[in-house]
Structures are given as structure tokens and as C-alpha cells.
Amino acid sequence: MPELPPLRDVIAKHGLSASKALGQNFLFDAQLLDRIAGIPGGLENRAVLEIGPGPGGLTRALLKAGARVTAIEMDRRCLPALAELSEVYPGKLSVIHGDAMKLDHAELMGEPFAVVANLPYNVGTALFVRWLGGETWPPQWTSLTLMFQQEVAQRIVSTPGTSAYGRLAVLAQWRSAASMPMKVHRSAFTPPPKVMSAIVHVTPDEMPEGVSARTLERLTEAAFGQRRKMLRQSLKGVPGAVETLAEVAIEETRRAETVTVEEFVALARRLGASRPSSNSG
């Protein structure tokens, strides 16, 4: 195993500090980082995409686990520290200076890959929703192991009837399995954020037949966009949705937070079947 200087020394050497504008918080605890890198399991010689590696704390743990890492970093200040890591692990780390929101990750990776990242807080949810979207399923990613604020993590794994349950839960659970294997105390970060964090782990399941991802996304967006309203009000903007509720035994007086993932899937399937498709064959 290569001998690496302590991460704090690397940060001091390169004059790095976490950027609030970029939503950065650095993790130094090597044991904690090793545990995070261990969640996907069996990373030896597997392709891993990391977003926002910063000075490379989690990157070290992933390389130590044997992964081939592609890291996308927007902060130019962090590039020299990551370049040093590339030299220690030749051929194992590819660093891309760019905005992860503007890159095609599947095209970039060119093979099945796991995503493991301490996501910058300001783009984390948007990236997550993007990975969960699209009509092509299963996706090219084999698992997502992501650090979020604990409140966001709880929204992803929540169940109907709870205050945390909403659009994120439905998008994460309708064709994937989502869990929260680890909570991370705020004191583990530099600088310590105001809130606790947690790791979410997501693996793709089979795609339910006859359901369009776009239809489901539109339904959840409308339903949870006005979550205090009854479905007959909140779904008015989705053509045919209110009329279709009765066909799948969902009372129109219910609110979105009581509707299960399975019920949303059934509604999307029925809605798709009742409207002419633009795709032939």
C-alpha cells in the first residue's frame, strides 16, 4: 500500500479551504472514509465515478479498495493535490476538471460504474434526480453511494404517511432499492456543517412494465408540488390524471403523502395506457 502524507498536510501544503460557494465540506477521518468506500462492496478493478473529490480523502479510500476512479472536480484549487494522488496510483485515477451537471456520465465512463461521492450540497439532489431518471433501465451505474444532509437522506428512504415522504422517495424507490446504511456526525467534517449527514445507498431493481419514467416524474412533481391539497386539485395539471384515479382505486380526496410508491406506479401505468403513445412498435 503506498505511503501517503496525512490529508491535513496535503491541504496545508496546497493552501486549501472548503468553499461555501461550491458546497464543500472536507472529511479527514480515514477509517470513516474506508467504511464509506466499503459500502458498495467488491470495488477491486471496478470503475467508480466520484463527484467533487476535493483534496481527495474519499478518493484515497476508493483507490485503496482497488477501484479505477474517474473524479470530476470543479474547484481548480484541488487539482494539484489530486494530481499527486494520480502519480501514487498510476493508471488508477483520472481527474476531470469540469461541472458534473454538464457532463454525460455514461458516455464519460464508457462501461458499467459505481458512483461513490461526498456530494457538494448545492448540486447533490439535482445529480441524484438525474441519475434516477430516464427511460433506459437498468442504468449504466450499478450503485449509488452518496453523502447527503441527513434530512435529504431521510426523504430518499422515507415511507408513505411520514412528513419526509415525497417526490424523492418515489423516484428513488419505484425501480431501485434505497437504504441509509450510515449516519455521519457533523464533527467529522471540516468545517463542520450546521446539520448531520448520512450515506444513502441505491441499487437498481427491475423496471416495472408499461410505465414511462417521464409520466411518473410529472405525476410526482404535480402531486407533491401541492402536497397539502387533495389529489383532485394537485393533479389537475396532468392531463387525464384525475379521471384515472378511480380506475386504480385511489380516492381523489387523498393527499400525495398517503399514496404509496406502488400506487403511483399503477397510476402512471394506467395513464400511459389510456393515452396514445408517440412511439411505434
UniProtKB/Swiss-Prot annotation:
Catalysed reactions listed for this entry: adenosine(1518)/adenosine(1519) in 16S rRNA + 4 S-adenosyl-L-methionine = N(6)-dimethyladenosine(1518)/N(6)-dimethyladenosine(1519) in 16S rRNA + 4 S-adenosyl-L-homocysteine + 4 H(+)
SMART domains noted in UniProt: rADc (SM00650)
Pfam families membership: RrnaAD (PF00398)
E.C. code: 2.1.1.182
Family matches, as InterPro entries: KsgA/Erm, rRNA_Ade_diMease-like_C, rRNA_Ade_Mease_Trfase_CS, rRNA_Ade_methylase_Trfase_N, rRNA_adenine_dimethylase, SAM-dependent_MTases_sf
Enzyme class: transferase
Alphabetical list of Gene3D superfamilies matching this protein: Ribosomal RNA adenine dimethylase-like, domain 2, Vaccinia Virus protein VP39
GO function terms (MF aspect): 16S rRNA (adenine(1518)-N(6)/adenine(1519)-N(6))-dimethyltransferase activity; RNA binding
UniProtKB keywords: Cytoplasm, Methyltransferase, RNA-binding, rRNA processing, S-adenosyl-L-methionine, Transferase
Family matches, as CDD domains: AdoMet_MTases
GO CC, any one term: cytosol
Predominant subcellular localization, coarse grouping: cytoplasm
Subcellular localization(s) per the UniProt record: Cytoplasm
Binding-site residues, S-adenosyl-L-methionine: 25, 27, 52, 73, 99, 118
Biological role stated in the UniProt entry: Specifically dimethylates two adjacent adenosines (A1518 and A1519) in the loop of a conserved hairpin near the 3'-end of 16S rRNA in the 30S particle. May play a critical role in biogenesis of 30S subunits.
Stated family: Belongs to the class I-like SAM-binding methyltransferase superfamily. rRNA adenine N(6)-methyltransferase family. RsmA subfamily.
PANTHER family assigned to the protein according to its UniProt record, in alphabetical order: DIMETHYLADENOSINE TRANSFERASE (PTHR11727), DIMETHYLADENOSINE TRANSFERASE-RELATED (PTHR11727:SF7)
Designated name of the protein: Ribosomal RNA small subunit methyltransferase A
Gene that encodes the chain: rsmA
